[in-house]
Amino acid sequence: MKKLFLLMSLMATTVIASATDVWEGTHAVTWDTPLKIEATKFADAKVGQKIVVEFTNATDVIELHSNNVMLPGTRYSQFIKDAGSIDTFITPSMLASLKEHGLEICGKEFTATKIWYGDGKDNVDENTVWTGFFWMDDWKTLELAKTSFDGINWSDYKAIRFCSEANRTDYVINVLTKWGDGGKLGDQTTMTMTPGYAELSLEGINMDEALKDVDRLMVQCNKEGGNAFNFTDIVLVKKETTGVHELSASPTSNTSEVIYNLAGQKVQNPGKGLYIVNGKKILR
């Protein structure tokens, strides 16, 4: 019995040690009186960990801000009536903002009591713009803050992947920037559907223009005839790079550069084909 008690005590100690307290007290949060946490409090935070905000007297919504804008990787205006806490999982861009600007807890009339971060998800992809667990049931909508895409060079990406635990493809999904005309980017009829994710091709979509005059990206799902499921990640999919560059008709303006064929032999007057120049594959 003593051994069992000792084991349980050690397990409890392990759980506690994995959590880092950021702030504790009572702060009446309104839109005019946010709770501000300095950046140094997140010095040891890591991608994939979850930030937990605890509160009481919740009546409406909460938002997480940083540098006076929505914190990248967070949901827009989370309704928290009758709730006691929210979990937010750290993405790469979120971590950068927290470490530089800190955190601001904003919302409508609730009392913040504690903030901490700790164990969350392992192996979060570096191109993840949102991660967490969002329950998709009947026409549920995840609203991701537009700041999650700040600094993105869309020409580097070919798709957006919406990952879930659905393990099926027969559900409805709508990817939207706004309600109404012109707001839909894709749905289950235009996206690539797999048991683990739905993928929106960016071919023909100008994402800079699509996000220009809006404040969020929305993902709406309906479970249809199957079970409800968790939505888990939104990941940008990079274009493949082959390492093959183009060689102009005049192969090089630098006469000191030497052109080799794939067998490692020098070539004086290369025709059409694949060559090696300065250690790079060059296509002529």
Where are these regions (language model features)?
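Extracellular ligand-binding interfaces
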Residues: 20-97, 102, 106-238
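C-terminal tail/sorting-segment detector
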Residues: 2-3, 274-284
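Sec-dependent N-terminal signal peptides
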Residues: 4-13
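Residue-level recognition of short loop/turn positions
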Residues: 125-127, 263, 278
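Residue-level detector of functionally pivotal "anchor" positions at catalytic/ligand-binding pockets or at interdomain
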Residues: 239-263
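Sec/Tat signal peptide C-region and signal peptidase I cleavage site
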Residues: 13-20
